[in-house]
Each structure stands twice: as C-alpha cells, then as structure tokens.
Regions:
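Vicinal oxygen chelate
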Residues: 2, 15-92, 95-104, 124, 132, ...
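Conserved short beta-strand elements that form part of the metal-binding/catalytic scaffold
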Residues: 1-21, 63, 69-78, 120-157, ...
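Generic secondary-structure microfeatures
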Residues: 117, 146, 167-169
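Intrinsically disordered, low-complexity, compositionally biased regions/tails
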Residues: 8-10, 168, 202, 215
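Generic domain-boundary/flexible-linker signal
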Residues: 37, 79-82, 110, 174
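Surface-exposed interaction/gating patches
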Residues: 91-138
Length: 230
C-alpha cells in the first residue's frame, strides 16, 4: 500500500519471512540517475547500485551509504513507477516534514548525502554533532548515535530513528487521533513513555527537539509531530 501527501510517498509493506519490520528504508528521487551514479563511482567506488525488481512502484535502483544504510533511488518517468509516485503533486495541511537516522559518524554521512545529491548541509537543531539536509520541503536529520542515549532503556542499533509530520493545528490533530481510537480501538497508537524504560526512551526522543508531540504508530515506529508556523 502506498500513501502520500502530494510530495512525499510512503509504502507500507507486509513483513515477509526473513525481513525486518519497522521503519526500514527511505528513497530519494533525482533528476538524473546517471549523474548520481557517476558521482558515487568517482568518490565511493565500493558502493554498489543495483536494479530493483520491476514490481516496485517507488524505486528503480537500490543503493547504500558508507555506513550500509540502504535506500531507494528513483527518477521521474521511469517505467516501473506507479501509484502515488506518479499521481502528480498537491498541497495538504498535514504532511511529511522530516525523518531522522542515528549513526556512528554523522559528519561523514552528511558529507556523503550532501555531495552525492547536492543538498545544502546545515547543523540540525537536534543537538551537537547533528546535521540536516533538505530539498526545501523534506528534511533529513543525521543524528549521532551514542550508547549512553539509551541509558535506562533498551539499546537500539544505529539505524533510522523516526518519522516527522507537520500539521496545521496540533490540537485538532490530537482530537482526530482520539476520535479514531474511539471509532476503532485497533487504530490506537502504541503507548509511549510507559514504565521506567518507556519513559527513558521517550525522553531520548524528546531531546531531539524535532517535535512538539511524540507518539508511535501501531507497529512502534516513533513519530514527531509539529504545528506549522503561521
């Protein structure tokens, strides 16, 4: 299943045998896939770019960064693209705003994404040693991974950390989530901040400062919500 906000698309895939669940990977659309391929081959010759199966409506190629994080690479007009990825653009009041990953070498990876994809690089408001790259609408935050951030809770490996959304009215959003929970209790977000370990994990999330409201989806993927500036 694919959903989108008129600019960013997201695929929600069933978990198959041997595959991880959760926030698995992201994708980047470029104007010229071959130009990206040339930049990667020149500076990162050990990084491989492979063809994805033809039934993927969201990706033509698979690639990874120097830390091994896999992501999709696509270009408008490629024959395998379909669904929300070819539905055109539109504006809406609730939209994707960012995503974040925690990594051992944030500066190294920030330089990779900035150089290969020609994205402006800035310091992230998430804290010391964090970086942000944006195309003007969607932002990637690269956060330092430190084992001490997980003191008092379960330790998570360096990986994608959370999704971020921007809404026009945070109070209205919270009300809608509550109404959805009443209509269908199975749609209730997974509880966060429950017990000592849950509280420690939630506090780690809040320290990023990338949201005003924090929750998790039904599968446990962490989500940061922020109200749009008017």
């Amino acid at each position: 299943m694919s959903i989108g906000d008129g600019y960013v698309g997201m695929n929600i895939n069933p978990r198959m045998a041997g595959r991880q669940a959760g926030f698995d990977h992201f994708g980047i659309q470029v104007e010229d896939v071959e130009a990206v391929r040339e930049r990667v081959a020149k500076k990162y010759p050990k990084i491989e770019i492979i063809q994805r199966p033809s039934n993927r409506p969201f990706a033509a190629l698979g690639i990874h960064d120097p830390a091994g994080q896999y992501f999709d690479l696509s270009q408008a007009g490629l024959k395998n693209r379909a669904e929300v990825y070819e539905a055109g653009t539109w504006e809406q009041k609730r939209r994707f705003s960012h995503f974040a990953m925690r990594v051992i070498e944030p500066e190294r990876l920030a330089e990779f994404y900035a150089g290969v994809f020609e994205l402006p690089l800035t310091n992230s408001p998430a804290g010391d040693g964090a970086f942000a790259l944006t195309d003007g609408r969607m932002t990637m935050h690269i956060l330092p991974w430190k084992i001490s951030d997980f003191l008092g809770t379960g330790i998570e490996r360096p990986a994608l950390d959370h999704l971020g959304f921007e809404v026009d009215d945070l109070a209205a959003f919270k009300k809608d989530v509550e109404e959805l929970r009443i209509v269908n209790p199975l749609m209730m977000p997974k509880p966060t901040g429950v017990g000592a370990e849950g509280e420690a994990r939630l506090n780690t999330f809040k320290r990023t400062g990338l949201g005003e409201h924090y929750l998790a989806d039904l599968d446990g993927v962490m989500i940061a919500i922020k109200e749009a500036k008017h």
